[in-house]
Amino acid sequence: MKLENQLIDRLNIGKNRYGHGVRVDSDTTKWGTPANSWVEMAREELLDAIIYIVADYIRNHEDPRVISEPDDNKRILEYANNIERIKNPSHKLQIWNLTNLLHSQLFTGDQRTF
């Protein structure tokens, strides 16, 4: 599916869920960001993407959770912080890409030009 179609689908989901499309002048703190910033909103979404991709990796490529553990948060953090432990190259690449995006100047606030 083309990127444009995927974006339209996501915009429609938001419109149906919230009753309107994206309003760029909206205060993002109403949706939980600490600052009124669409970049902050994107940063949170990238962090969520890392969590979801690691969760998918664990589900499909590692042993199931020990029943005594209430969730997989600790395992997710272990893999996210040590991507060399991720054996599947597709999962590893996506985590690497997302991590590098989060370290880019747009998300770090570093306004120097390179």
Protein language model regions, located:
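Intrinsically disordered, low-complexity regulatory regions
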Residues: 1-114
